Curated annotation (Swiss-Prot):
E.C. designation(s): 2.7.7.6
Main location per the UniProt record: plastid
SMART domains to which the protein is assigned, alphabetical: RPOLA_N
UniProt function note: DNA-dependent RNA polymerase catalyzes the transcription of DNA into RNA using the four ribonucleoside triphosphates as substrates.
A GO CC term assigned to this protein in UniProt: mitochondrion
EC top class named in words: transferase
Encoding gene per record: rpoC1
Localization, UniProt: Plastid, Chloroplast
Reactions catalysed according to its record: RNA(n) + a ribonucleoside 5'-triphosphate = RNA(n+1) + diphosphate
Protein name: DNA-directed RNA polymerase subunit beta'
UniProt GO molecular function: DNA binding; DNA-directed RNA polymerase activity; magnesium ion binding; zinc ion binding
Pfam families linked to this entry: RNA_pol_Rpb1_1, RNA_pol_Rpb1_2
Record keyword Cell inner membrane present: no
Length: 680
């Protein structure tokens, strides 16, 4: 069993037959070595108990803790109890949880290629051997034979490479000159077929020589350059890509200490029984996992092949080859049903679920049980936009918040002597008393939460936020953090988690808060940038007059867009005078009172220390007043001067939308300046 405290990662790869045997072999207290599964029986149809020496009991431990297959009971861990196993059925008196991790193995009568390495694209076996996949498939499934180049020995057949077994005349004429046993010896020495031929070729490979030869060939192809023939250039490009993949694959085998011949199986691991259970349903019927039926099929065919090879010496070679092909197909179906075409079905025309079907996909063992399993102190809901939230805050619905922080609220009620025990505190929470929400607010103030949106493809897929209570049942999120999550507000769901330990809370505050992750970890570009709805909002907010006062004064066609209203009695336009405001608060107040629109042009008094005057710009108009003051009107601003031509006031021509955007930017800059000054 994997110790979760000692092992922090899981790696899947090829292993040697010796390692498979070490995992599955177990020595009983009487010295008997068990682990190999030889019989295909499961449960007896009368007693509903496992058959002895099958792949359900003796090799894997008792079904119930301390109870053997005979029904005898022993106390687990008691030193006085003797013996430690049942002498009749051979079952050891141990905890039944051993059946979740105790493996077995099937000793195959012939080598069998692992279908993942042969049929999956790209084919690792084809890449290493540098041979077409179709030829290798014909060799594995006994459609072709391989003539062995035996060195330092005379060869009777002058054959090299692959040839079709069925069309050779030698198999009819040569046996006339040999005895049956002599012909079998000759054939086994010079002719090879099936997965054994693949295993021999893989075992003869030198990975370092493969890397050197592939690099040399790649350089030679690169020196040739373009031939001018598009077809030849594509062929060379595909060959170069293949050589790169072959080098990377060989380096991976060297780096992970994996031998290529391990892709051909000699021992087939048998899963622990609890991972392929047989359960009893109503009516006394048994329901079995599909993998049990597929294992049973492998054992039947393997035992038949063993009998043909050991007990019947006069068995024709064609029959042995046919049975080897059946064993190969049975193992293929067990590992990946349907990968070679038509999948295997049961009597009800239902496709059997193979090992690949059990582990792959959204409902597979990894994504559903190990990675996507539900955990405590977590929730899930739809996300909606929260434009009024700060960047580091998220809106948490009351219904979710009270469930996530319930234990903290109970502790707060008891500490403040508002509840005498846990039961009373839970009663107050169920009744939703006002004091509960007050304590919940206090608890949430100092406790961050983690928001995660699947799939988590990079570290910004999970970030920390300071939660605030909101009405409704949806999680509110600031729109600027959506790009890191790759989220939008069209029905996306996000999970919320509560970090419990002090270390997790510190990590969330120092590393995972959203305002601490403003740059992309991959390329360093800003990731908290306006997108989608925010860009449209900014456009609407600043979509006032960009062409100055001349558009409104001298272009009658555009007057309707700038508060020029059409009279109902004639076809003339009435020009509404653009209002003047002394500060931005008055302008926003007028907008809230609906005296002006969001994009209505207005004149806003500007500070004298922030000049907007262009040195070479000349005024469009100059208005003089009776007291000697005069107005210089430019395209986007207006200057009020005294009699001595001193600047009294400066007005800029803007809109309420521009004012609101400027105030937000100004407040953000001031907040950053205060934070920087306090930090230094």
């Amino acid at each position: 069993m994997i110790d979760r405290y000692k092992h922090q990662q899981l790696r899947i790869g090829s292993v040697s037959p010796q390692q498979i045997s070490a995992w599955a072999t177990k020595i009983l207290p009487n010295g008997e070595i068990v682990g190999e599964v030889t019989k295909p029986y499961t449960f007896h149809y009368k007693t509903n108990k496992p058959e002895k020496m099958d792949y359900f009991v003796k090799n894997f431990g008792p079904i119930k803790s301390g109870i053997c297959a005979c029904g005898n009971y022993r106390v687990i861990g008691d030193e006085k109890e003797d013996p430690k196993f049942c002498e009749q059925c051979g079952v050891e008196f141990v905890d039944s949880r051993i059946r979740r991790y105790q493996m077995g193995y099937i000793k195959l009568a012939c080598p069998v290629t692992h279908v993942w390495y042969l049929k999956r694209l790209p084919s690792y076996i084809a890449n290493l051997l540098d041979k077409p996949l179709k030829e290798l498939e014909g060799l594995v499934y006994c459609d072709f034979s391989f003539a062995r180049p035996i060195t330092k020995k005379p060869t009777f057949l002058r054959l090299r490479g692959l040839f079709e077994y069925e069309i050779q005349s030698w198999k009819y004429s040569i046996p006339l000159f040999f005895t049956t046993q002599g012909f079998d010896t000759f054939r086994n020495r010079e002719i090879s077929t099936g997965a054994g031929a693949i295993r021999e070729q893989l075992a003869d490979l030198d990975l370092r020589i493969i890397i050197e030869n592939s690099l040399v060939e790649w350089e030679e192809l690169g020196e040739e350059g373009h031939t001018g023939n598009e077809w030849e250039d594509r062929k060379v490009g595909r060959r170069k890509d293949f050589l790169v993949r072959r080098v990377e694959l060989a380096k991976h085998f060297i780096r992970t200490n994996i031998e290529p011949e391990w892709m051909v199986l000699c021992l087939l691991p048998v899963l622990p029984p609890e991972l392929r259970p047989i359960i009893q349903i109503d009516g006394g019927k048994l329901m079995s996992s599909d993998i049990n039926e597929l294992y049973r099929r492998v054992i039947y065919r393997n035992n038949t092949l063993t009998d043909l090879l050991t007990t019947s010496r006069s068995t024709p070679g064609e029959l042995v080859m046919c049975q080897e092909k059946l064993v190969q197909e049975a193992v293929d179906t067990l590992l990946d049903n349907g990968i070679r075409g038509q999948p295997m079905r049961d009597g009800h025309n239902k496709v059997y679920k193979s090992f690949s079907d059990v582990i792959e996909g959204k409902e597979g063992r990894f994504r559903e049980t190990l990675l996507g399993k539900r955990v405590d102190y977590s929730g899930r809901s739809v996300i909606v936009v929260g434009p009024s939230l700060s960047l580091h805050r998220c809106g948490l619905p009351r219904e979710i918040a009270i469930e996530l922080f319930q234990t903290f609220v109970i502790r707060g009620l008891i500490r403040q002597h508002l509840a005498s025990n846990i039961g009373v505190a839970k009663s107050k929470i169920r009744e939703k008393e006002p004091i509960v929400w007050e304590i919940l607010q206090e608890v949430m103030q100092g406790h961050p939460v983690l928001l995660n949106r699947a799939p988590t493809l990079h570290r910004l897929g999970i970030q920390a936020f300071q939660p605030v209570l909101v009405e409704g049942r949806a999680i509110c999120l600031h729109p600027l953090v959506c790009k890191g999550f790759n989220a939008d507000f069209d029905g996306d769901q996000m999970a919320v988690h509560v970090p419990l330990s002090l270390e997790a809370q510190v990590e969330a505050r120092l590393l995972m808060f959203s305002h601490m992750n403003l740059l992309s970890p991959a390329i360093g570009d800003p990731i908290s940038v306006p997108t989608q709805d925010m860009l449209i909002g900014l456009y609407v907010l600043t979509s006032g007059n960009h062409r100055g006062i001349c558009v409104n004064r001298y272009n009658p066609c555009n007057r309707r867009n700038y508060q020029n209203q059409k009279r109902s009695d004639n076809s003339h336009y009435k020009y509404t005078k653009e209002p003047f405001f002394s500060n931005s608060y008055d302008a926003i107040g007028a907008y809230r009172q609906k005296r002006i629109n969001l994009d209505s042009p207005l004149w806003l008094r500007w500070r004298l220390d922030q000049r907007v005057i262009a040195s070479r710009e000349t005024p469009i108009e100059v208005h003089y007043e009776s007291l000697g003051t005069f107005y210089e009107i430019y395209g986007h601003y207006l200057i009020v001067r005294s009699l001595k031509k001193q600047i009294l006031f400066i007005y800029i021509r803007t809109t309420v939308g521009h004012i609101a955007l400027y105030r937000e930017i100004e407040e953000a800059i001031q907040g950053f300046s205060r934070a920087y000054s306090s930090g230094t």
